[in-house]
A protein has these predicted regions:
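Metallocofactor- and cofactor-centric catalytic cores in central/energy metabolism, strongly enriched
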Residues: 1-407, 414-494
Length: 494
């Protein structure tokens, strides 16, 4: 079992796959480097002299610079490495696009909607347009579980505090996000629940929603009825009868849309779980499916890896606009763009934002980037897509769901229990986490660090698990009933 890994031949550090004690000789490139201090798992060790001001190279890319001279065997982390990042950058397009060889798709057992779209779940959702009716929505879910029969996979609501006391861009984003959730293919039927006096009016929601199936989506305004729980049950009976007509049938994996996200990352994220997701992404895209990469702030410092893979200059310009637009968002709030790695990230071995970003983008595999889409917009292009969204787990996972993701692959080195509205598969970066939190973790990519599987083998295993989940196998979060949303907010609350 290897002690450490040199990710790229250009690197001047290795990453400890397991804790390395001071004095341990670590094999590197046919020789050995002796650790001059303890190196925690997931952390970096210098394998060559690195002078103060010299770049620290990982993934073949500068992830920061040394702030003090370091001899081989030195622990390289926040105490002696700093970021190179600043503000906006002038980007230029240098195409490095390598289309994937097509592969015949497999099938999964999914649902076929009347509009032709594929689905992996057949649920009834109650979507509140305003936080004032959150408890009404929860009561309707609680009191109507008897309607979950036959092929209906569940009755759920997604509460939030917005829909009123918002103006401008925030109000528009809330409206757009909620309408996008109502259109999600995994929803067999939808009850849109309103109060009646909120900023997000019924008419505004209808305008945002556009054309819709009146049997699939129904509305209830609580102020218009004597008892909203009685009226709501009658509507839910109709929606349940509509949703029950859908049955699972064989569907091509080329119709899958899968979101990709990481959270609670550690030093192994970019070595095990994220590249495993990247292998999966390439497999699905080669079969004609779609994957979605988001977390724009966690692309800072590694965006060049992605931009040169844009399929053409139009997509490249959209990517530039997205990256610099998010930097402007930070700067407008007097925030520095590089102040990202969390305490948990740092404890797990991530030192700078470049370090985190280089690991984050591994989820994108090697496929060309076919499109860049905005917050609340749906995926319309096959292949790898980039989505405007923050690094925050709940906000970005909600955005992935709104984009039409049938499920979300979520890598984590620290562990997290949450689930999005779409089935959320947790992928552990290390075997210790997978063993400790077996009720959170769906897939253990730590087998790569343990030497039990190659990345290609782990990616193939993950692909099969995705087909199983698409066919109805529940994720850990689904089994616990963990699912929620969080809406991106920028402005004032009235």
């Amino acid at each position: 079992m290897p002690l450490a890994i040199k990710i790229n031949p250009k690197d001047n550090v290795v990453v400890a796959l397991h804790p390395i004690a001071k004095g341990t000789a670590v094999p590197v490139d046919g020789a050995s480097v002796t650790a001059v201090e303890d190196i925690p798992q997931g952390h970096k060790m210098a394998i060559a002299p690195i002078h103060a001001g010299e770049n620290v190279i990982k993934y073949g890319f500068p992830i920061g610079h040394a702030t003090a001279d370091a001899v081989p065997g030195t622990w390289m982390h926040t105490h002696n490495v700093k970021t190179n990042l600043s503000g906006e950058i002038e980007y230029s397009y240098h195409p490095n696009v390598h289309p994937l060889a097509p592969v015949a798709p497999e099938t999964f057992m999914g649902y076929r909607r009347k509009d032709g779209r594929a689905a992996t779940r057949n649920e009834i959702w109650i979507i509140p347009t305003v936080g004032c009716v959150n408890d009404c929505a929860k009561a309707l879910v609680r009191d109507n579980q008897d309607l979950v029969t036959d092929s209906i996979d569940g009755l759920y609501t997604f509460t939030h505090p917005f829909g009123c006391s918002q103006t401008g861009h925030d109000h528009a984003q809330t409206r757009k996000l909620l309408a996008a959730l109502a259109r999600h293919p995994n929803v067999g039927a939808v009850l849109v629940l309103s109060l009646g006096c909120e900023n997000l009016t019924h008419e505004q929601f209808l305008t945002e929603l556009g054309e819709y199936d009146h049997d699939r989506i129904k509305f209830l305004t609580c102020q218009d009825v004597d008892d909203e729980l009685v009226a709501g049950r009658e509507i839910l009976k109709e929606l349940a009868a509509y949703a029950a007509q859908f049955q699972r049938e064989p569907i091509s994996s080329s119709e899958l849309v899968v979101g990709m996200k990481c959270g609670g990352s550690d030093g192994l994220s970019g070595i095990t779980a994220n590249p495993t997701i990247g292998r999966f992404s390439d497999m699905l895209c080669a079969r004609g499916g779609s994957t979605v990469l988001t977390e724009v702030p966690e692309m800072f410092g590694a965006e060049g890896f992605l931009m040169d893979r844009c399929q053409n200059e139009k997509v490249f310009e959209k990517a530039v606009h997205m990256i610099n637009g998010f930097k402007e968002y930070f700067i407008s709030h007097n925030e520095v763009v590089y102040d990202n790695p969390s305490p948990g990230n740092k404890q797990g071995g991530i030192t700078t934002l470049e370090d985190k970003s280089c690991g984050c983008v591994q989820k994108g595999g090697s496929a060309p980037i076919m499109d860049v889409i905005g917050y609340g917009d749906a995926v319309t292009t096959k292949g790898l897509n980039m989505l405007y969204g923050p690094g925050n787990d709940l906000v970005s996972a909600t955005a992935l769901t709104a984009a039409g993701a049938h499920m979300i692959l979520f890598s984590t080195g620290r562990g997290t229990p949450f689930g999005a509205p779409a089935p959320t598969l947790k992928i552990a970066t290390n075997s210790q986490l997978a063993a400790k939190k077996s009720t959170w973790i769906d897939f253990n990519a730590g087998v790569v660090a343990d030497g039990e599987k190659t990345l290609d083998e782990a990616g193939a295993d993950l692909y099969q698990l995705v087909l199983d989940v698409a066919s109805g196998k529940q994720t850990c979060a689904e089994k616990k009933g963990f699912r929620e949303i969080s809406i991106f907010k920028d402005g004032v609350v009235l």
